[in-house]
């Protein structure tokens, strides 16, 4: 099984930073990264194979024949910027069902070897006790 697929050539990136938005709690983190993607000229360049980390959760039936449903995509996008750093953005469509640390290690390994990243920025959300009258904040 191929764990990594490079769909197009990657040119020289300027001191690339890996940005990851993990889905989960209300999709807060992944929404932040999607906003970044949608406000720039990002290009999908590759993907990780989801089969080691996700199970098929549904099926499609066509003309009485069952087909496996789709697995979540684990895409890498490139954003070329006008600053000192270009961005490599990883956007998983779902949290891994198993082997989550293995996926994290694979992600970092591919990002280092393929994109030569220099830094990693991750977005994630966690719930906390907030009273209705409290002002929302980001920590």
Regions found by a protein language model. Give the residues of each.
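N-terminal short beta-loop-beta anion/metal-coordinating cradle
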Residues: 1-94
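Glycine-rich phosphate- or other oxyanion-binding loops that anchor nucleotides, phosphorylated ligands
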Residues: 68-139
